[in-house]
């Protein structure tokens, strides 16, 4: 049960505790870089000043007509590798392969892909494991899994690794 401030009790199967943040962009703004939900970058993670790169939680890239920041360790590593290749002169475009995990007490949440724009969702539940599979016109976009590493691994290693871009 979850007790609200009003004292009312609500039955829940799972409670997710999450926080969010805003990127610190003062230095980028002072450097006259473009800001759009973070430090705006192009496909090579260059800022509006091509001699400056941004990576990690602060980097905001074009995604489906908007600007997206992926706030996760995996994304920071992937973007850092792309920036390093570009600095070394190997022109490389960033290819977002979103994945995320967190453990909260005895619950494990894992996410692979992005579910924005989904048209259908399939729920798979077995005992204390549940996963949600997101599709757009029969194309798998993402999976959210709770205590179900098999579903997460299936999507992250077979589906996400096989695709070059996500729209």
Where are the regions that the model predicts?
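Residue-level detector of beta-strand face positions
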Residues: 1-3, 40, 101, 132-133
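Single conserved hydrophobic/aromatic residue that forms the stacking wall/gate
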Residues: 159-167
